[in-house]
Amino acid sequence: MSATKLTRREQRAQAQHFIDTLEGSAFPNSKRIYITGTQPGVRVPMREIQLSPTLIGGSKEQPQYEENEAIPVYDTSGPYGDPQIAINVQQGLAKLRQPWIDARGDTEELTVRSSDYTKARLADDGLDELRFSGVLTPKRAKAGRRVTQLHYARKGIITPEMEFIAIRENMGRERIRSEVLRHQHPGMSFGARLPENITAEFVRDEVAAGRAIIPANINHPESEPMIIGRNFLVKVNANIGNSAVTSSIEEEVEKLVWSTRWGADTVMDLSTGRYIHETREWILRNSPVPIGTVPIYQALEKVNGIAEDLTWEAFRDTLLEQAEQGVDYFTIHAGVLLRYVPMTAKRLTGIVSRGGSIMAKWCLSHHQENFLYQHFREICEICAAYDVSLSLGDGLRPGSIQDANDEAQFAELHTLGELTKIAWEYDVQVMIEGPGHVPMQMIRRNMTEELEHCHEAPFYTLGPLTTDIAPGYDHFTSGIGAAMIGWFGCAMLCYVTPKEHLGLPNKEDVKQGLITYKIAAHAADLAKGHPGAQIRDNAMSKARFEFRWEDQFNLALDPFTARAYHDETLPQESGKVAHFCSMCGPKFCSMKISQEVRDYAAAQTIEVGMADMSENFRARGGEIYLRKEEA
């Protein structure tokens, strides 16, 4: 039976209550730890899962235990994961990166906003109740300067952001001593470079080569540095955003916090409804992770939703507006060229990308080349002044497996490769967006084409969905493809929720999508052989074999669901120490039987060993002390 559907008023009230009562909190039996770096202010948060000891012998009255090491894990929740930090959504998060940005001395505060739209919004008194109170004074690069992480990397500069990332990517695995936990199967990396220890210099080198990006707008100092690249942990993006028919500012902030709690490495705000500007300000000021947008959505709202009325001037104003708010990466559909649009005519599902369809309609109605392509160098100049990364959109991605890997898809991909080189001329960081709907046997070609034609820039894919028959379960159909393409080298996976193709996701849908994609990303890290990726799996397996139920729950990606499923049939506290679960019961538990076999074998080994020693003793004549030459 599904839960009672809340009214719009109830949904908003629930979200407001969530925000008003929000506190920093850790997962069960976890604690927040920080690992410090060598540069000022580099203090990297991680979550450490505390484990119970293993019973190794003794008696019922005097049992003997062996301690189990705590397991450090990557944590995207920012201050929301630290019970010691007071959270106030009205004030926003602390500006972690502000001292680093200021110390570089290459930015200046703006006395006047560059965007006419922003000026108009700020002058509108009617928006005061909606507006975030502590609006940041935006910065931009000083004249003649570039402030991107790519620029610094190419200059040989290791920024605090790079050191922060190096520590974060190592996940504290140097703290683990147990050989059982450190054991790892060799991976198949398909050419990825996966060093045993990630250093700040390695991070710098990968960024300088364009193989990785650090989305870090100078106007989003609240964000904790992270990296997207195939030689690092596979990342996951969550999409949130209102629409013309549903959701509010409160609900979107709630979804942001919820997303970071469940492992979103970045969040895209895809709002298309009212108060886009104000919603985004609330999100940015409260986000510990990079925020991406699709600027064409808001530009379209500014021309009343009429694609033909879009202009470069309106789009440019939108870029400036969002860059000065702090958006970390823009999805730009600059590869949808006029000559590619006819290639989609024979497709089963045509053009399914919103941004792609908007630009295709504009091109056809004006019979002109895509203005994003025509003005791409100007786009790069704007991005270089704020360190906004470019996510080059796949506007011609396939919307069904029948259309996978067709002429239009790869023609656009090749153009994205050309645009990548242009962006790099301006020291602008770039990643490439990918499909979509692709059956399993056709997935790897997407990765090889991208690496070859886009010069190893990071790949960022939506799934891909491997079958089209499962509306309501597309987090599964796409999670399969996501795990595969992540293994092949995809750097970031855009989650798909159960509501894909059906409606706007709610809070629970966001969680389901993220858990599915964290599984896919982790499976890809294991398959690639990412150093340390197997530690948590080994800890879980050890806890499972030793019937440490609480540790099993706490090591899970979703401890609450794991515990709830167990407690449906064994709710008593005794069930948390039982050497069986309800699947097999006490007599047929394979792990319990395995333990008994192991104990029996160990006892037999001791008994046989003692018999051998006894026989040897008798053969030597039964003397307690042997002559020196006989010893």
Swiss-Prot record:
Do the record's keywords include Cell cycle?
Answer: no
Q: Which GO terms describe its cellular component?
A: cytosol
Q: What does the record say about how the cofactor binds?
A: Binds 1 [4Fe-4S] cluster per subunit. The cluster is coordinated with 3 cysteines and an exchangeable S-adenosyl-L-methionine.
Give the pathway annotation.
Cofactor biosynthesis; thiamine diphosphate biosynthesis
List its EC numbers. 4.1.99.17
Provide the residue positions that the database annotates as binding [4Fe-4S] cluster: 581, 584, 589
Catalysed reaction equations from the record: 5-amino-1-(5-phospho-beta-D-ribosyl)imidazole + S-adenosyl-L-methionine = 4-amino-2-methyl-5-(phosphooxymethyl)pyrimidine + CO + 5'-deoxyadenosine + formate + L-methionine + 3 H(+)
Query: Which amino acids does the record list as binding Zn(2+)?
Result: 437, 501
Q: Recorded GO terms, molecular function?
A: 4 iron, 4 sulfur cluster binding; carbon-carbon lyase activity; zinc ion binding
Its required cofactor(s), as named, are:
[4Fe-4S] cluster
Report the domain of life of the source organism: Bacteria
Q: What class of enzyme is it?
A: lyase
The UniProt record gives the binding positions of substrate as 239, 268, 297, 333, 353-355, 394-397, 433, 460
> Coiled-coil annotation: which residues?
none
Task: Name a single GO biological process.
Answer: thiamine biosynthetic process
Q: Does the keyword Cytoplasm apply?
A: no
Role played? Catalyzes the synthesis of the hydroxymethylpyrimidine phosphate (HMP-P) moiety of thiamine from aminoimidazole ribotide (AIR) in a radical S-adenosyl-L-methionine (SAM)-dependent reaction.
Q: Which HAMAP family match?
A: ThiC
**What family is reported?**
Belongs to the ThiC family.
Classification via NCBIfam families = PRK09284.1, PRK13352.1, thiC
Q: What is the name of this protein?
A: Phosphomethylpyrimidine synthase
Source organism per entry reads Escherichia coli O127:H6 (strain E2348/69 / EPEC)
